Design a protein with these regions (language model features):
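Short capping segments at the starts of secondary-structure elements
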Residues: 21-28
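Basic amphipathic alpha-helical segments that dock to polyanions
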Residues: 48-58
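Short alpha-helical segments that sit at the start of domains
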Residues: 1-15
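Short amphipathic alpha-helical elements of helix-turn-helix/winged-helix folds
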Residues: 13-21, 35
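Non-DNA-binding regulatory cores of transcription-related proteins
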Residues: 60-63, 67-146
Length: 146
């Protein structure tokens, strides 16, 4: 994080956990907390939440929230993409979609606003749920994330 303020040890650990998961991974605060506890047993849940909030403020990680959803997910900064929230199993997956710049420019001009980013989240069924095999629902019920 060149040019960024020095972070407390615990925040660095949180950042490492999110970045180590790589692009395409989406972890909840609970997932990150569990991994942090493996490496630093004394770390508290509130510390993880404060660290996630600060890292998002700095742009070191990204937060994805689903309206009316129960959780937020965190991911490393990545090239522009969208997400699909599976309404059956609750999984969040990356999808290859970027809002067309022409559409964003037209919207900004029409509404007299400046658009900094387009964050797109689709709702529907992920590939396994759309195929109807139920594997994702069973896997997630057993507490296993991708």
């Amino acid at each position: 994080m060149n040019g960024q303020p020095r972070l407390p040890r615990n925040y660095e650990l949180i950042r490492e956990i999110v970045l180590a998961a790589g692009c395409g991974s989406h972890q909840t605060a609970g997932d990150i907390f569990a991994k942090a506890r493996e490496r630093r047993p004394a770390i508290g849940y509130a510390t993880v939440h404060r660290g996630l909030a600060r890292l998002c403020e700095l742009g070191a990680i990204l937060k994805i929230e689903i309206p009316s959803g129960d959780a937020a997910w965190y991911e490393p900064p990545a090239p522009a993409h969208a997400h699909l929230f599976c309404t059956r199993c609750g999984e969040l997956v990356d999808v290859d979609y970027v809002a067309p710049q022409q559409t964003l420019r037209a919207l900004a001009q029409r509404e007299a606003v400046r658009i900094a980013a387009a964050i797109v989240t689709f709702r529907g069924l992920c590939r396994p749920c759309a195929a109807g095999d139920g594997a994702n629902v069973e896997r997630l019920a057993a507490g296993k994330r991708r």
